[in-house]
């Protein structure tokens, strides 16, 4: 997020003021027994991977039960929707205003792909789709952020280094 601060911002209704956030409060869309809840992991930029994982577990467990404290539902700056958790493969995510971007992650699938020698091999594929507020973000910015994000998923040690 620090390389793409516009993704961690909000715009007012008449698009006359853009506010950048210092904290990265990442919303996690959860299919709960009372409907969609989006609690957020506060200040992700200040947490290590273990702290993020523990907070993710706490928030998703409480959200699934419909018992998320109100303070955990406020202040999100960008959201992630894991439609793969309920079997989905692709979706067009809907922006959680006043946020300006959201990503939807599909389920991991093993699909046939060609390798560098033209042979068909099984590859792990996850569909990722973004929605962004075009008053603030252009497609190129989202594409570059997505490429960086993809590189981190493919090389977790690089992600760990970036988080330190």
Give the positions of each predicted feature.
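C-terminal catalytic/motor cores of large multi-domain enzyme assemblies
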Residues: 2-164
């Amino acid at each position: 997020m620090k390389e793409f601060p516009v993704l961690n911002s909000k715009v007012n209704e008449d698009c006359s003021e853009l506010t950048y956030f210092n904290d990265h409060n990442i919303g996690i869309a959860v299919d709960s027994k009372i409907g969609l809840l989006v609690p957020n992991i506060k200040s992700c930029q200040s947490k290590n991977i273990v702290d993020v994982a523990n907070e993710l577990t706490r928030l998703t467990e409480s959200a699934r039960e419909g018992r998320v404290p109100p303070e955990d539902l406020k202040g999100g700056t960008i959201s992630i929707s894991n439609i793969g958790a309920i079997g989905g493969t692709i979706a067009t995510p809907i922006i959680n205003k006043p946020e300006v971007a959201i990503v939807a992650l599909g389920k991991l699938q093993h699909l046939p792909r060609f390798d560098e020698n033209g042979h068909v091999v099984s590859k792990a594929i996850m569909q990722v789709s973004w929605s962004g507020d075009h008053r603030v973000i252009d497609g190129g910015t989202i594409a570059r952020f997505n490429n960086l994000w993809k590189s981190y998923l493919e090389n977790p040690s690089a992600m760990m280094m970036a988080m330190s």
